[in-house]
């Protein structure tokens, strides 16, 4: 079983989604998890303990394991991510330029089959729609919006 498959099986078995996995040349394994309610430190600790056990049993060589949430600017990698975050602002970088550009910033639209939509501003005040598939995407990330001025009552 490959490392990605092993980690994904473990993470999903605990009720979380594997968002991303990075392995550095220095033996560090970084695992990014999520769930609809968000991720807490306790969630990261629970997954870390289970992964440490699994990696030891499977004799996977690693120096350090980090488990964390994907953050506010989480990557979008699966079609389900684009469905979940429809209506959110995102930046999409395409593998090949379209109309002379590769990077687009706008509002995600829910996928229609395999086609994903991004409403962006072509010129000042002129909205346009970019239709693309996962195969067209090099990178996609949410754009975080944090309001430090609002207060809970």
From Swiss-Prot:
GO terms for cellular component: cytosol. Pfam families: DUF150_C (PF17384), RimP_N (PF02576). GO terms for biological process: ribosomal small subunit assembly; translation. Its main location: cytoplasm. Keywords: Cytoplasm, Ribosome biogenesis. Signal peptide: none annotated. It is found in: Cytoplasm. The keyword Ligase does not apply. Belongs to the RimP family. Required for maturation of 30S ribosomal subunits. This is Ribosome maturation factor RimP. It comes from Burkholderia pseudomallei (strain 1710b). The lineage of its organism: Bacteria, Pseudomonadati, Pseudomonadota, Betaproteobacteria, Burkholderiales. The gene is rimP.
